[in-house]
């Protein structure tokens, strides 16, 4: 597995925060690194396989990566990221207690992926731009300023994620996307889902297409197919069983959609013919 060392990304041994844009981020094999990072998805789509679990990421996704997490990117489509790197929560010169603001693992579950809406993403970009402007400056005032900006970023992300509620349609769409991630195998009635999240069906279609580039049903099908591909690679379940577990009522229809999406059949994936990135 590829290991990315901090010496390749931080300008000096005293630098506590660094910005690493990926515009765009191509498919990249599984790796980890000896530092922490906050991955901010600007726009585009892709699959983030994080500690073995696949997540569909789109504009507004935020992922908190620890120094022992392993992950890869695949099936990327114009995926643009900004990575905010930091050595460790306890390696700041002027900040203490940051762990209390970061996601915490509970009973083996780590809430690594958050979502923020477009207006928050704009504020995030402004803070990141200010941090970028000060890169290369290692005097104490510049270091303190960068760390203060990092704290502001962390507070903004935490507050915005915790307050992601039904106040506006963008927030409601983010809640809907998070709901789909957990209920992708359910029978989805889009009229009922729109009502559940207080969106008109037209608004749901328009905003989801703007955010993901896909219609709602196309997005759901892709989500199901991604989950199915993961199971084909990492479980012994039959193709038919996987199709049903991922929300498809007809295994033949599943196989047709699968080949159309990936240019490989489910059997090809099971046998490793696609040359899966390791």
Swiss-Prot record:
GO molecular function, one term: DNA-binding transcription factor activity
Lineage top rank: taxon: Bacteria
Subcellular location: Cytoplasm
CDD domains according to UniProt: cupin_RhaR_RhaS-like_N (cd06977)
Residues under site feature: Interaction with sigma-70: 241, 250
Main localization (coarse): cytoplasm
Family annotation (SMART domains): HTH_ARAC
Domain HTH araC/xylS-type: 174-272
GO cellular component: a single term: cytoplasm
Entry's Gene Ontology BP terms: positive regulation of DNA-templated transcription; rhamnose metabolic process
DNA-binding residue intervals: 191-212, 239-262
Record's keyword terms, sorted: Activator, Cytoplasm, DNA-binding, Repeat, Rhamnose metabolism, Transcription, Transcription regulation
UniProt-listed NCBIfam families: PRK13503.1
Task performed by this protein: Activates expression of the rhaBAD and rhaT operons.
Summary of subunit composition and partner proteins: Binds DNA as a dimer.
Protein's name according to its UniProt entry: HTH-type transcriptional activator RhaS
Gene name per UniProt: rhaS
